[in-house]
Regions:
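Thiotemplate assembly-line natural product biosynthesis machinery
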Residues: 1-24, 78-84
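N-terminal helix-turn-helix DNA-binding core of bacterial DNA-binding proteins
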Residues: 30-37
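Short, structural beta-strand-to-alpha-helix junction motif
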Residues: 33, 69-70
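Catalytic nucleophile serine of serine hydrolases
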Residues: 41
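C-terminal structural segments of small proteins and small subunits
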Residues: 65, 71-79
Length: 84
């Protein structure tokens, strides 16, 4: 079973790879990614789409913006993982 820590670690890796100019690797898990983390909204959607695929989740559109920090992102992915 996937843990929140695994999702946060992978999210950091994906952001560092996909958004090298924007992502701040020192952002804390509870800080907003769209301001302190340096990620813009298009970059955020790109990262979330990658994580959805990797963790077998389907995040409804109305929940995407709940994932404002790494902590919240992990929670949203875990809540929406497909069972089985």
């Amino acid at each position: 079973m996937t843990t929140a820590e695994e999702i946060k670690t992978r999210a950091r890796e994906v952001m560092a790879r996909e958004l090298p100019e924007d992502y701040d690797p020192n952002v804390k898990d509870d800080e907003p990614l769209l301001s302190e983390g340096g990620v813009d909204s298009l970059g955020f959607i790109h990262v979330l789409t990658i994580l959805e695929a990797e963790f077998g989740a389907h995040v409804p559109d109305e929940e995407w913006w709940d994932a404002t920090s790494l902590d919240a992102l992990a929670e949203v992915i875990l809540r929406n993982q497909k069972q089985g």
